[in-house]
Regions:
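N-terminal glycine-rich FAD/FM-binding segment characteristic of electron-transfer flavoproteins
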Residues: 1-176
Length: 176
């Protein structure tokens, strides 16, 4: 099952091509802009109502902001930055990259509810057949604690001579 927050107009039923059977859609104007606490509260309501025991996020900036709050709210074990789907053959074990990617740790999670955030490209998705059932979910949505009053996008480029930090990389030459 999946959760879609906000007034999304795209064809979310098409997520069924990736194995999602049911999508709980929570439409509310308060969900227009990300407020991690508000999102965590709404996702907790959906998870509890559907009886979810595993909640999966992408390890994006949004996932990194929401998943720890949801973990605290649901008293759930959290593994952030997983590099593979969980192994459930003997409990619930998640593989995670550690020491700047130089090693891997297998983390066992024993709480009744588990939350993981998957690193990009942790597993390959392949489109198949099917459509998901989209169900409207009525959640209590708190007023956001932060209000977005405007969005100013940066334009143009910083010239190389005016940049505060310049990062350069290369293979170099083996000789003069």
């Amino acid at each position: 099952e999946g959760v879609v927050l906000g007034n999304v107009t795209e064809d979310i039923a098409a997520l069924g091509k990736y194995g999602v059977k049911k999508i709980h859609q929570v439409s509310n104007d308060a969900l227009k802009h990300l407020d991690a606490q508000v999102y965590a509260n709404v996702i907790a309501q959906v998870a509890q109502a559907s009886g979810a025991t595993v909640v999966v996020f992408s390890n994006s900036m949004d996932g990194k902001a929401i998943s720890p709050r949801l973990s605290a709210r649901m008293k759930a074990g959290l593994v952030a930055g997983a590099v593979a789907l969980p192994d459930t053959s003997n409990g619930f074990t998640v593989k995670k990259s550690v020491f700047s990617g130089k090693a891997f740790a297998n983390i066992s999670v024993a709480t009744p509810v588990k939350i993981i955030s998957l690193s990009p490209n942790a597993y390959k998705t392949e489109a198949g057949e099917g459509t998901a059932e989209v169900v409207a979910f009525s959640a209590t949505v708190d007023a956001p604690k932060v209000k977005v009053t405007s969005v100013n996008k940066a334009s143009g480029e910083v010239s190389l001579t005016e940049a505060e930090i310049v990062v350069s990389a290369g293979r170099g030459l083996k000789g003069p």
